[in-house]
């Protein structure tokens, strides 16, 4: 597996410009499109590269996937059990309380308030993640990545609840 940052000719940093990422992705897709190949071997190689470009783009454009990938590049693999062990009992309790709050909320306006709350939590966490990666503090980056994963779980559960209320 080639380094996704290198593949897209981007600096290996968490705080990437998503517009530049998209521009690089499309430029590389044009360059390595299988239909532009002159030989069958070249076409096969371009198909492999094109597939890798798709994976790289989908990973790097998402804040959580990008954080997990950057940690993986440092040989830190966040599986579910490890994520649970990174958060304090208080943080886990807060998470479960929020899950319960979503479950028990019935008014659409209250669900919208929760949505705004979780978006703010996500943005604050991403800002902390950016700082942790700038400082190369992998311990903090790991913790903030696990928190972001929990926030995403809350957002997903909330989206399901909002859909069921419509």
From Swiss-Prot:
GO terms for molecular function: ATPase activator activity; protein-folding chaperone binding. Keywords: Chaperone. SMART domains: DnaJ. The keyword Transmembrane helix does not apply. Residues 3-73 form the J domain. Pfam families: DnaJ, HSCB_C. GO terms for biological process: [2Fe-2S] cluster assembly; protein complex oligomerization; protein folding. InterPro entries: DnaJ_domain (IPR001623), HscB (IPR004640), HscB_C_sf (IPR036386), HscB_oligo_C (IPR009073), J_dom_sf (IPR036869). CDD domains: DnaJ. Interacts with HscA and stimulates its ATPase activity. Co-chaperone involved in the maturation of iron-sulfur cluster-containing proteins. Seems to help targeting proteins to be folded toward HscA. Belongs to the HscB family. This is Co-chaperone protein HscB homolog. It comes from Rickettsia prowazekii (strain Madrid E).
């Amino acid at each position: 597996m080639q380094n996704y940052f290198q593949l897209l000719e981007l600096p290996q940093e968490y705080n990437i410009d998503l517009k530049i990422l998209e521009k690089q992705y499309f430029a590389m897709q044009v360059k390595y499109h299988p239909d532009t190949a002159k030989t069958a071997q070249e076409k096969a190689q371009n198909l492999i590269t094109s597939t890798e470009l798709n994976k790289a783009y989908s990973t790097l454009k998402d804040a959580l996937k990008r954080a997990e990938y950057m940690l993986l590049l440092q040989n830190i693999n966040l599986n579910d059990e490890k994520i649970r062990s990174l958060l304090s009992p208080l943080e886990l309790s807060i998470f479960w309380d929020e899950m319960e709050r979503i479950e028990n909320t019935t008014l659409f306006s209250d669900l919208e308030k929760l949505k705004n709350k979780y978006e703010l939590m996500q943005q604050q966490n991403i800002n902390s993640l950016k700082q942790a990666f700038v400082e190369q503090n992998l311990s903090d980056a790991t913790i903030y990545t696990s928190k972001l994963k929990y926030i995403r779980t809350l957002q997903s559960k909330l989206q399901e609840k909002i859909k069921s209320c419509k």
